[in-house]
Amino acid sequence: MTRTGVKAPALNWAYCTNGFAGHRLHEALVILSELGYTGAAITLDHGHLDPYAPGLTAEVNRIAGLLDRLGMNAVIETGGRYTLDPRRKHHPTLISEDAERRVGFLSQAMRIAADLGAPVMHLWSGVKHEDVPEETAWARLARQCEGLLTTADRLGITLGFEPEPGMLVEDLAGFEGLRAMLGGHPRFGLTLDIGHCQCLEPDDVAACVRRALPYLVHVQIEDMRRGVHEHLQFGEGEIDFPPVLAALAGYQGQVAVELARHCHAAPQVARRSIDFLRTASQEGRRQYGRDGAAGEGVAGAGAVAGRG
């Protein structure tokens, strides 16, 4: 119950489709719906809404119709490892000298998001190589983000920028610095990966959630250990989930399980994950109530992603 006596809505459980890479996208969505997930974080890649495939428009329309029938919402994720370069993981990035292909890909991803009715597109900075000066990398990133925000404004999409361990922007402080460089643009929001908070942030995970709330538009979740960037199934890491999920109470955007390395047992892992999260969320409400409850995040994008 909230402090006003009104029961807080359930969190919007979602699953990242990179964890179902061995499934056709429509099959993955049906399975997730059957398990009780209300959202899908769709990773654009060769097998799932390939942004360069012939017939993309028809496939997007087909998936949009399926999402409607299943009553599911969507976020577009862009973390495919070899989507743009078959030999170099995640290349090029927004801080590469040859960033044009990444910018074009992200622009296409926003168009797909708009056609699906998905209000958020996820993105990240990239790894800074030793031969690139720090100030050059930050200047490139800010410049490319400014251009992407122009497209986002035109299409009505909010960017959900993810700090990623080992990349130029790897923590909340880095995100806040970049957002300040962009003038606090209302469509520049945060994708918070709960495991990353455990991995490298100085504060405890629940405190990271509370710090993130003013910018929060998308959440990725999995277990993790301190100092080790490895996405683990729930219960295999060190995170105390009830207070973390209690801190998210009232947040309406996706809370999306990200276990891309568990495709070999995707349906079973997805089932275990939602069972764990529901139990931990109930325990969080029982122990912590709704103190520190979430708002809508940037540009209202904490609201449920969907077509209608």
Please provide the spans of the model-predicted regions.
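Catalytic-core regions built around general acid/base machinery
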Residues: 59-70, 141-151, 208, 243-247
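Active-site beta-loop-alpha junctions enriched in small/polar residues
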Residues: 16-20, 45-47, 79-81, 126-128, ...
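Alpha/beta catalytic barrel-like cores
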Residues: 21-32, 43-46, 87-92
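A short acidic, helix-capping loop that chelates divalent metal ions and anchors anionic groups
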Residues: 48-51, 85-88, 129-134, 198-200, ...
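Glycine-rich, proline-tolerant flexible connector loops at the mouths of alpha/beta enzymes
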Residues: 43-64
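Active-site acidic/histidine proton-transfer and metal-coordination neighborhood
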Residues: 3, 26-27, 68-70, 83-189
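Conserved alpha-helical segments that form or flank metal/cofactor-binding pockets of metalloenzymes
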Residues: 75-77
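Histidine-acidic metal/acid-base catalytic patches
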Residues: 2-14, 21-38, 68, 103, ...
